[in-house]
Each structure stands twice: as structure tokens, then as C-alpha cells.
């Protein structure tokens, strides 16, 4: 049975089902009332991901439109395949890297298969959402190793968990806020949930023994936060040394530039 579209009852676009569907180019809608579609069970319907609509009882002209649209998309993808192995350059000849944005290791294979030269952002918070407890070190390690296998030597930048704020996690006691985008989230929760952060650092470090991984910290706004993160990273490295577990000793650490105040300390980072 080949799936041509998916309606998901969950309201989040971060559910594992949605992520998997997206990685296989399956049109998907979230927050669908599946029960309301019962009268059209075993009948042809069309899922329009661009319009956010499900079309039932399509007339002949509507059916022709969507069939033609599918052919156009297939032809467009085929035309674009010629660029998969080409270098990307600006109009004035400057070489630039085209990197992918992924939320799970299953997306890495599709990203590299479509010509990505690396993963510029692996949004790990998705691994913590839509579940009843946080992922353990072994689970995270296996996920990162799976992504590295698809990378085949190319670089992956892993952003540590940006949870809290507009990305709530039910099993953590993080209160809702009026302005969640710059609130108690990401690096600001790491000290309270230090064991969670250390677990993630250990899993990234362990996976770095198998490929090119880099670490990026979200929502940094002060030098104190950077120094605290570096301290925790050093502790995680020492733990692994004591346990004789290999990792990349020279793994790169960076920050995501997204908080305005970080611009006042950017010169101190070099």
C-alpha cells in the first residue's frame, strides 16, 4: 500500500508521524478531525497541503487539476535533479554552502539525497516533544549516529534542545508565559535541568567519534551563559574520558545569533 497523503489528528507539526511524512514528500495536514471524514472512507479524496484543505467528492475538473499538479511537481523535481551535484555560487561568483534544516535523523537521508552539502541546523527539541519522558543518552546517540551515516563525512551542526516557551514539553514543569519567544527556554532552562543537558551533551560527544558533528547553543544572551555551557561541556568530556569512551576532542562549539543583546558581546567570542 503506497501512501499518497496523510491527515494527522495531532495539532503539532513536530509529531514524529508528520516529520516522517515530510521526509518522504507525503502531503500532510495536522489537526484533522478524522471522524468527520468517515462518510468518505474508501473513496478518493485530495489533500492540499498548500491550501490546508481536504477535498471530498471532487468533481471531474477538480480531479484533473490535482492530477495535473502532481505531474507538474514530479516534472519540476526531475528538472532540478541536474543541480544536485553542482556547486552553489552567487551571481558574482562567490561560493556558498547549501545546508539543510532537519528535526530528526530520518530527514537527513532526504536532505543529502537532494543535494545538501551539510546540515546547518539539527533542531533537537523535536526529539523531546510529543512523548511522556525525555529521551535517554543511548536513544539520542543512536539518532545522531543515524544522521551521521547519511552525512557520509559531511558536517552536521546540532542545536541543543530549545524547549520551553513556544515549544512546551508536558513532562517538564515550565510555566506558560505571555511572551514565550524571549522567555524561559533553551539555554535559560539548562541550569534547572542540568542532568537533561548533560545527557544531551554526552550523546553528541559520543556520536562525534563517528563523523563531523558541531554543537550550537540557542538563545545565548550573555558571556556568563557561554562560560557555564563550556564548563558543562568540559565536565561531560571528562566523564567520557574517565569511562574510556571515544569522542572528538576538538568538537566545535558555537552559538545561535537570535537574541539582540548578544551583539554587544560578539566581539568577545573571537
Please place each PLM-identified region on the residue numbering.
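Extended, non-globular alpha-helical segments
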Residues: 1-4, 41-83
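Short, ordered loop/turn segments at secondary-structure junctions
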Residues: 11-13, 32-35, 50-52, 59-61, ...
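Single conserved hydrophobic/aromatic residue that forms the stacking wall/gate
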Residues: 1-10, 270
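Conserved alpha/beta-domain cores
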Residues: 77-269
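General beta-strand structural signal in soluble alpha/beta enzymes
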Residues: 8, 28-31, 47, 56, ...
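Structured functional modules or segments
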Residues: 15-43, 47-51, 55-57
Amino acid at each position: 500500500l503506497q501512501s499518497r497523503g496523510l491527515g494527522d489528528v495531532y495539532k503539532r507539526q513536530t509529531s514524529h508521524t508528520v516529520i516522517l511524512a515530510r521526509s518522504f514528500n507525503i502531503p500532510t495536514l495536522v489537526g484533522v478531525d478524522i471522524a468527520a471524514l468517515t462518510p468518505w472512507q474508501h473513496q478518493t479524496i485530495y489533500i492540499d497541503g498548500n491550501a490546508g484543505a481536504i477535498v471530498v467528492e471532487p468533481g471531474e475538473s477538480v480531479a484533473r487539476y490535482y492530477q495535473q499538479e502532481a505531474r507538474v511537481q514530479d516534472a519540476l523535481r526531475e528538472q532540478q535533479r541536474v543541480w544536485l551535484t553542482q556547486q552553489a555560487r552567487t551571481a558574482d561568483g562567490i561560493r556558498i554552502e547549501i545546508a539543510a534544516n532537519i528535526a530528526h535523523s530520518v530527514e537527513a537521508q532526504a536532505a543529502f539525497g537532494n543535494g545538501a552539502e551539510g546540515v546547518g541546523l539539527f533542531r533537537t527539541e523535536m526529539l523531546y516533544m510529543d512523548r511522556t519522558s525525555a529521551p535517554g543518552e543511548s536513544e539520542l546517540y543512536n539518532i545522531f549516529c543515524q544522521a551521521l551515516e547519511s552525512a557520509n563525512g559531511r558536517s552536521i551542526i546540532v542545536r541543543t534542545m530549545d524547549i520551553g516557551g513556544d515549544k512546551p514539553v508536558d513532562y517538564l514543569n515550565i510555566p506558560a508565559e505571555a511572551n514565550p519567544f524571549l522567555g524561559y527556554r533553551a539555554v535559560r532552562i539548562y541550569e534547572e535541568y542540568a542532568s537533561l543537558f548533560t545527557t544531551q551533551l554526552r550523546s553528541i560527544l559520543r556520536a562525534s567519534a563517528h563523523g563531523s558533528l558541531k554543537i550550537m547553543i540557542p538563545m545565548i544572551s550573555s558571556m556568563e551563559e557561554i562560560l557555564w555551557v563550556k564548563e558543562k561541556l568540559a565536565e561531560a568530556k571528562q566523564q567520557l574520558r574517565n569511562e574510556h569512551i571515544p569522542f572528538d576532542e576538538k568538537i566545535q562549539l558555537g552559538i545561535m545569533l537570535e537574541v539582540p543583546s548578544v551583539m554587544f558581546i560578539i566581539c568577545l567570542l573571537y
